[in-house]
Each structure stands twice: as C-alpha cells, then as structure tokens.
Amino acid sequence: MNSLPTMILAATLGALVGARAAEAAQPDADIARFITAKSNQVYLATRDGGAPVPPEVWKMFTAASSGDWKSVTNLLQDITANDHSGAMHRLAPEIWFRVQDVGGFCGLISSNNLKFIRLFAEEVFKVVPPGSIYFGGSDPGRFIITALSRSQEEGQPFFTLAQSQLVDSVYLTYIHRLYRQQVKLPDQTMVNEAYQEYTADARQRFEHDQQFPDEPKQVFSGEDIRMVNGQMQITGQVPFIVINGLLVRDIVRLNPERECYIEENFPLPKWEWMYPSLEPAGPIFKLRRTPLEPLYEETVRNDREYWQRLTRRLIGLVVHDETDLAEVCASAQELSGKSKDFQGDPDFLQDENVRRTFSRLRSAGAGIYTWRVSRAKSSSERRQMVREAELACRQAYLLCPKNPEAVARYLMFLISEHRIEDAQKFITAALKLNPDDQTEKDWARYIRQMSDWEKNHR
C-alpha cells in the first residue's frame, strides 16, 4: 500500500533535499500549486497498490517545492537513467509523465529568466480560447504551458498535448486516462494506420529517387531509407516526426467542435498537409480545418504588428521593409555585445536561452510565409509573402543572432530569391558572431561556390 508510509517516507527523504534548498527562493504561488498538484496526482495514482514509486521521485517533488531547481534537474536525470530510459522496470505512465512535467519545467526555470517564461505563457494564453486543443512542440512550448495552466487535468484554460510524443503508445495511454473522454484521441489502430500511411509514402519517394536519379530528390533530409533483403528499413527521427504530424491531423479531425493551436517543434515541411491551414496567432499558430487561400489580410497585418511590438519591447528595434541588410547585420553585431543606447530589455539580452526561444518562434512564422511564396496565386500575393518572410527572417535573426535555425532560414530564403550576393554578405556577418559554428562554415562554402558558378555562367 502506498499511503501514509509513503508520505512519511517522502517527507523524510525530502528533508535531506530541503536542508540543501533552505536558501533557495520559494516558488511563486501558481508554480507551487502546480508542483503540489502533480505530486498529489502521483500519490493518488499509486496509493492503492499501484506501481512502485522510487524514492528519488519524492525527493524531486520536495526539491521543486523548495525552489531548488538544480537538485530537481539532477534528480530528473537520475530518474531518467535509472528508472525510465532503458530500465528493466520502467516507471508507470501516471508517474513518469508527471515527473517529466515538473522536472522539465523546473529545468527551464533553472536556465531561463522566469520573467520571459511568464511572458511566453501570457502570450499563448491570450490567443488560445478556452476549451481549445494546444499542441506544444518544444520543451518551453510544452512544459511552460502545462505548468502555468490553471489545471492541465481539467483542460483549464485549454487541453495541452505534446506533439512529439503522440506516436508513443505509453504517452497515448497516459493522456487517454488524463483527459477522460474530454478530448477524443487516436487509439492504437489509428497509430498503426498512420505508420502504414507514412511507410507507403516513404517507399514511393524512395523508389522515385532510385528510378529517376537526375530529378530532385523526394526522400527527406535526415530520412535514411534502405532496402535490406527486400525489406525497406527506415532510421532516424524523420519517421517519428511525420507520424506525429499525421496523428495531430487525426486529433483535429476527431474533435471538430474544438479549435486547435500548435507551437512548432521541428521545422515542418514534412507536414505538408498542415501548412495551408496554419494561421499566425501571437507567438504560435492556429490550425484551421480548411486551407486558407490566401492568408487573410488582417491576419498578416496583425502578425506584423504583433512582432513589431514584441521586438521593440525585447531588443529595442523595429525592422522595416526598407531597412538595409547591412544595417540588420550591424544591429546584430551590437545586440551580441554591449549595445550602445540599448532601448530594449537588458535581461533579455543577457539570456541566450530565452533569446533562442523567441527567435525560434519568429523563425517558424518565416517558414510559413516562405512556403507560401512559391504557392502564391498572384504576383501581388507573392510580393506580400516575400515581404513578410524577409521581415520575419530578419526579426528572428536579431532576436538571437547565434540561433543557427534563424541563420539557415534566412539564407535559404535569400537563395530561393536568387539573391546570392546578399546571402554572401549575410553569412559573412553571421560567421563573425559565431566563428566556430561548423554548419555556418559549410553554408559560407556552399554560397561561395554558388557565387563562383554564377560569375562563370553570366
């Protein structure tokens, strides 16, 4: 029985952590409430002879209640290594995912300024209506929203799902129990169907590349497909990314009465079905059920104004369409050091993790606009999408010049627009701020080769 003895054990073990955490700042009331709720849920789920709870779990909850974020992070690593990843006796879902929620959030607090953690949450809560379904992609997008919601279990203010774990049958079991039919979710049959849909498509793309080697490759970057003894084998992260995307699609279809929102995890070109239905909404996207052709003028205008306000607040800059590329690069140089006459938030400038988070959010928007450039139905729509894509690329870069995703996204945009000279200027400036980054060195070499080719074929 996991009842009073367990609680006494937890208190005893917790005292060991509490002694070390005595000087730690106590969590804010809403954070303390979240930690207590998750701890109580583990206790209630296991008190009547359920799965055993390792003592490190109670230690972790106690450390979290004391605001000892470093100890929480260390204990989560121990729990993951000893009782979850590759362990013979893995933690039960009702324990593991609650441990992960608390440990993941506390880890973010330990490495990010809490002010900006709250800013992200506030911006998401502003745009997602009550009762909606929200797919968190990155660790911040998942753990922050889970922790700062009024109640994850009751879907208050909305229902949060981890998009990157939908393919995991253990996670699906957990959220089925968690939401108790409030949200309709895929069953194992639907997961199997998504897997079969992906493998059939992967086989078709692989066979195309084998039969037509001179045509553009259809196999995705990072998708390792091989034929072994007549059987197709696929390795890498891509299958999981694509299948998770198909399960997001299924959840949207299963819940026609609920609005859906998504925070991008990986860049999503492999979720081709989703792009036409994504609409910028604050720092994330609304996922509509029908494609938007084209994006509403009001949506584009609101997105531009939103990020102009936010970049002014965070980095003290407003980028305009007519801002010269050299000026953007010079501003990035200033924002990477001690900026003169800085008009933004100095705390933001000093927090590289937070800068990367907001840069990634804006870069995701640039990806949507770039995708629409090549699919525009008119020259005026194309010009508008080019304009919005470049603005978003520049803002993402200035928010965090050392974010390789923002650098790569802007370079790919410039190359797609046949602006090789600008791409060369940009990567030269970016490398000055990140001289040891091998990916950026590779980009510089590639763009130099493109430039040489253009000169030789004029």
Residue ranges and their predicted role:
Residues 1-8:
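Bacterial N-terminal signal peptides that target proteins for export
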Residues 10-20:
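Hydrophobic h-region of N-terminal signal peptides that target proteins for export
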Residues 18-401, 405-407, 415, 419-422, ...:
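ER/secretory pathway lumenal C-terminal domains and tails of membrane proteins involved
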